[in-house]
Amino acid sequence: MLIIPAIDLKDGHCVRLKQGIMENATVFSENPETVALHWLDNGARQLHLVDLNGAFAGKPKNGEAIRAIVEAVDGRIPIQLGGGIRDLETIEYYLDNGITYVIIGTAAVKVPGFLHDACYAFPGQIMVGLDAKSGKVAVDGWSKVTGHDVIDLAKKFQDYGVEAIIHTDIGRDGMLSGLNIEATVELAQALTIPVIASGGVTNLDDIRKLCEVQSEGITGVITGRAIYQGSLDFKEAQALADQLDAATI
């Protein structure tokens, strides 16, 4: 089980939002590359970047900060990136410039043909972010909830060849209210591709509970506010996950 630190970018800074609302942003650092190196030094094996301005604008907006992070990490661990990625040219640019996985969210829901083309053009490097509220998919930086069922869409996207599904419960994201493990397990059981959990991680107990069900196909968990505010110690979390992994082998 990978514990994946989130670096959310707004106006070039590392922030966290509550429930995806841009006005509810807490700035944690004005130097995102320093944050990336901090997590790398603490044993992170993958990073999760989100261009928040890009997610709302529908096009990349934090290019300078993303470049700085990629240069600082220097290929030592994989980086996944989402937010405002709506065309093949943007995907190609990011993958050519140090990003390992590109996460498609809104565009996957609104223009499924684009996702299909992306998976064909860049096999093994496309993830889909499904942001859910009460089992329905939200789009446009979480500002609109659609009528699409999360599991139905995920199955369709799996057939396209996506590498993994990142499942975020937006009612819990940034709220430190605990993961929606039940919904994540239900999704993972319906799929054969990996599911990465996100939204609401609070403490080691959440990590322990998630590790108990990882055999359902949950390979990682993204955490943000908890590791920045200190309710979850990143090193302890990854050590616990490794320990529980070893116990199940």
Swiss-Prot record:
InterPro entries (alphabetical): Aldolase_TIM (IPR013785), His_biosynth (IPR006062), HisA_bact_arch (IPR006063), Isoase_HisA-like (IPR044524), Isoase_HisA-like_bact (IPR023016), RibuloseP-bd_barrel (IPR011060)
Similarity-based family: Belongs to the HisA/HisF family.
Any GO BP annotation: L-histidine biosynthetic process
Keyword presence, Repressor: no
Keywords: Amino-acid biosynthesis, Cytoplasm, Histidine biosynthesis, Isomerase
Record's subcellular location: Cytoplasm
Active-site residue list: 8, 131
Stored Gene3D superfamilies: Aldolase class I
EC number(s) stated in the UniProt entry for this protein: 5.3.1.16
Pathways per UniProt: Amino-acid biosynthesis; L-histidine biosynthesis; L-histidine from 5-phospho-alpha-D-ribose 1-diphosphate: step 4/9
HAMAP family assigned: HisA
Reaction catalysis annotation: 1-(5-phospho-beta-D-ribosyl)-5-[(5-phospho-beta-D-ribosylamino)methylideneamino]imidazole-4-carboxamide = 5-[(5-phospho-1-deoxy-D-ribulos-1-ylimino)methylamino]-1-(5-phospho-beta-D-ribosyl)imidazole-4-carboxamide
Organism: Nitrosomonas europaea (strain ATCC 19718 / CIP 103999 / KCTC 2705 / NBRC 14298)
Protein name from the UniProt record: 1-(5-phosphoribosyl)-5-[(5-phosphoribosylamino)methylideneamino] imidazole-4-carboxamide isomerase
